[in-house]
């Protein structure tokens, strides 16, 4: 039994668009924030292929972001203000959002983090994601940080290693575009030990 956390943005939502343009002073880029309707298929896949899931949390910025067709009894809605410190809101950057997902009240120790464009297309079992209390992860190994995203990954890898007392490495890991198994207790520990850096990155 484990939980699922999904982050979601509907770039067509007038409330969200108004806030985005007000705080960023740039127009919404449709190619970046367009809703392709994939969330519905992700939820169908979870229901059909992952019967061991306890709760499904949908993390959004505002209630207007929740699709009208969503089953409110099935989906547990989490607003950014429920998990992200007020001084960092509103945010339109995925990094502060992802760094605070483990703070969802009632979240299980073992949880899976999904984007809305990731789908379970075959039958899954709990051991696909966690074994003996450890996460089964799919990561790429890199030596060079050739773009901004990889630089963020490299820095995150370094901070996590320091926080958890792991040896430094010339290599760093980058997650594949698949769901990420997460342990809440580990996230709590890293969050506490590198809180200053997290707050700086959230500002």
Q: What is the role of each PLM region?
A:
Residues 11-34, 139:
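A solvent-exposed, charged loop/short amphipathic helix patch at secondary-structure junctions
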Residues 136-203:
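Long, charge-rich alpha-helical interaction segments
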Residues 64-65, 100-143:
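GT-A fold catalytic core of metal-dependent nucleotide-sugar glycosyltransferases
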Residues 30, 34, 64-108:
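Active-site-proximal specificity loops/subdomain of glycosyltransferases
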């Amino acid at each position: 039994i484990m939980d699922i956390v999904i982050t979601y943005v509907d770039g067509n939502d007038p409330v969200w668009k108004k806030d985005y343009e007000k705080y960023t002073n740039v127009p919404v880029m449709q190619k970046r924030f367009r809703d392709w309707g994939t969330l519905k298929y992700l939820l169908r896949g979870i229901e059909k292929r992952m019967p061991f899931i306890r709760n499904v949390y949908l993390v959004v910025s505002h209630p207007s972001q929740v699709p009208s067709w969503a089953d409110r009894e099935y989906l547990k809605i989490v607003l950014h203000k429920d998990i992200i410190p007020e001084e960092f809101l509103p945010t339109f950057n995925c990094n502060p959002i992802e760094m605070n997902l483990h703070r969802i009240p009632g979240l299980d120790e073992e949880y899976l983090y999904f984007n809305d464009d990731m789908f379970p297309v075959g039958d899954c079992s709990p051991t696909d994601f966690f074994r003996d209390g450890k996460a089964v992860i799919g990561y790429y190994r890199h030596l060079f940080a050739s773009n901004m995203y990889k630089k963020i990954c490299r820095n995150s890898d370094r901070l996590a290693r320091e926080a958890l007392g792991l040896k430094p490495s010339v290599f760093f890991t980058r997650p594949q575009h698949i769901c990420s198994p997460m342990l809440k207790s580990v996230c709590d520990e890293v969050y506490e030990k590198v809180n200053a850096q997290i707050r700086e990155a959230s500002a």
